[in-house]
């Protein structure tokens, strides 16, 4: 996993719930590449046709609220979303995203400072977010080191497998 991510912004508002991220009728699918074809269709039905690998989602407050389904961050990862930045996250979504290896950063004021289509450069190690379109630099909350280790391993399961192998 790269610690510097560059991508185009897809912007969403406050209280984007897991049904907007991945509607419940698609929970019969479990593979990231299958889920990708339905991701964000609860908010924008054409999103899967428009999103490109490396793109970044910017959300408002309470992004990922609702049910605790792991399918939502898994679908975002399957669609090639490189990072999710929001004013705040629902805690269960935050944890599920880390568990599946999807980077995210909380950044107060991000909604007012970026527009859809802007290009961002995100430093996961420092939390610095550069809007390459406007030149503005924002400071997000950097992830704790142990969460960075989980992301670098590709998610919680690969991380645990690595740790178990190291201890033998």
Curated annotation (Swiss-Prot):
The lineage of its organism: Archaea, Methanobacteriati, Methanobacteriota, Methanomada group, Methanococci. Optimum temperature is 70 degrees Celsius. It holds the Pfam family Aconitase_C. Optimum pH is 7.5. One of its GO terms (biological process) is L-leucine biosynthetic process. Pathway: Amino-acid biosynthesis; L-leucine biosynthesis; L-leucine from 3-methyl-2-oxobutanoate: step 2/4; Amino-acid biosynthesis; L-isoleucine biosynthesis; 2-oxobutanoate from pyruvate: step 2/3. It comes from the Archaea. The keyword Amino-acid biosynthesis applies. Keywords: Amino-acid biosynthesis, Branched-chain amino acid biosynthesis, Isoleucine biosynthesis, Leucine biosynthesis, Lyase. Heterotetramer of 2 LeuC and 2 LeuD. The heterotetramer that can be formed in vitro between HacA and LeuD is inactive. Belongs to the LeuD family. It is an enzyme of class 4 (lyase). InterPro entries: Aconitase/3IPM_dehydase_swvl, AconitaseA/IPMdHydase_ssu_swvl, IPMI_Swivel, LeuD, LeuD_type2/HacB/DmdB. PANTHER family: 3-ISOPROPYLMALATE DEHYDRATASE SMALL SUBUNIT, 3-ISOPROPYLMALATE DEHYDRATASE SMALL SUBUNIT 2-RELATED-RELATED. GO terms for molecular function: (R)-2-methylmalate dehydratase activity; 3-isopropylmalate dehydratase activity; maleate hydratase activity. Its EC number is 4.2.1.33, 4.2.1.35, 4.2.1.31. It catalyses: (2R,3S)-3-isopropylmalate = (2S)-2-isopropylmalate; (3R)-citramalate = 2-methylmaleate + H2O; 2-methylmaleate + H2O = (2R,3S)-3-methylmalate; (R)-malate = maleate + H2O. Enzyme with broad specificity that catalyzes reversible hydroxyacid isomerizations via dehydration/hydration reactions. Catalyzes the isomerization between 2-isopropylmalate and 3-isopropylmalate, via the formation of 2-isopropylmaleate, a step involved in leucine biosynthesis. Catalyzes the isomerization between 2-methylmalate and 3-methylmalate, via the formation of 2-methylmaleate (citraconate), a step involved in isoleucine biosynthesis. Also displays malease activity, i.e. catalyzes the hydration of maleate to form (R)-malate. CDD domains: IPMI_Swivel (cd01577). This is Isopropylmalate/citramalate isomerase small subunit.
């Amino acid at each position: 996993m790269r610690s510097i991510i560059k991508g185009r912004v897809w912007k969403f508002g406050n209280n984007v719930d897991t049904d907007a991220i991945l509607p419940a009728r698609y929970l019969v699918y479990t593979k990231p590449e299958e889920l990708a074809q339905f991701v964000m269709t609860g908010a924008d039905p054409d999103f899967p046709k428009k999103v490109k690998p490396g793109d970044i989602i910017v959300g408002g407050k309470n992004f990922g609220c609702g049910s605790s389904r792991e399918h939502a961050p898994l679908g975002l990862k399957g669609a090639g979303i490189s990072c999710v930045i929001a004013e705040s996250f629902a805690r269960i979504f935050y944890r599920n995203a880390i568990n599946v290896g999807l980077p995210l950063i909380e950044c107060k004021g991000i909604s007012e400072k970026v527009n859809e289509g802007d290009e961002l450069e995100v430093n996961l190690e420092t939390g610095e977010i550069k809007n390459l379109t406007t030149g503005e630099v924002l400071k997000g909350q950097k992830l704790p080191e142990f969460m960075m280790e989980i992301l670098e391993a590709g998610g919680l399961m690969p991380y645990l497998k690595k740790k178990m192998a190291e201890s033998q």
